[in-house]
Amino acid sequence: MNAFTNNASLVIYPSNPNWTPDNPEALINTLQKAGLAGEFLKKDKNSFLVGEKFLDHISFMGCSPNIKLENEDNDGKFTFIQITITETITALTGKHSFSPHCPHCKKPEKNWRELLQDNQLTCNQCQTKSDAWLFNWRKLAGFGKCFIEITDIYPKEAIPQPSLLDSLEKSFGVSWGYFFYHA
């Protein structure tokens, strides 16, 4: 499933795929207080400009990342933050997601796209049926009900600082991770 409309994103999400904030506004306030998220984007109450401390929380790889933090060209191709909360566990896999590795036998499941049903996968190697999020997706797919999407970030172009993930865990009592979504 593709819940995102952006081509490439860094996505931060809770390790428990069933977790959602009791109050979504608390998540927004936490991100704004930390300076990761800034002002709301126009009428959308789930999208934000990056905050004043965005670059303190996200580390860019390489010596010269080419990111736009403002919509200078009015084309919508710039880095902003979007929060997505769903009622059911959502699988976010792009066409660039690699074969995940089985949590039991550790072998790759090459036919995962055909086998993924109701967020379950059965390994063709060992025949073990598992929740899909237990497979090792190598940070190229994720499952959950709550996602913090940082748009216009390509795979391995940037990563969240551990201090940001620790702050989210301290605020909400659940550990957080990240993955890259690339349509």
Can you describe what each PLM-predicted range is?
Residues M1-I89:
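N-terminal alpha-helical interaction blocks
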Residues M1-S9, E114-D118, G142:
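His-enriched metal-coordination microenvironments in redox/metal-binding proteins
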Residues T20-A37, T86, K95-H104, P108, ...:
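Ampiphathic alpha-helical segments that act as solvent-exposed interaction surfaces
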Residues L31-A37, Q117, T122, P162, ...:
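A composition-biased, non-transmembrane "mature-region" signal
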Residues E70, S99-H101, T151:
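A structural detector for beta-sheet-dominated domains
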Residues I81-L140:
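Cys/His-rich short segments
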Residues D131-A183:
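Long, charge-rich boundary regions
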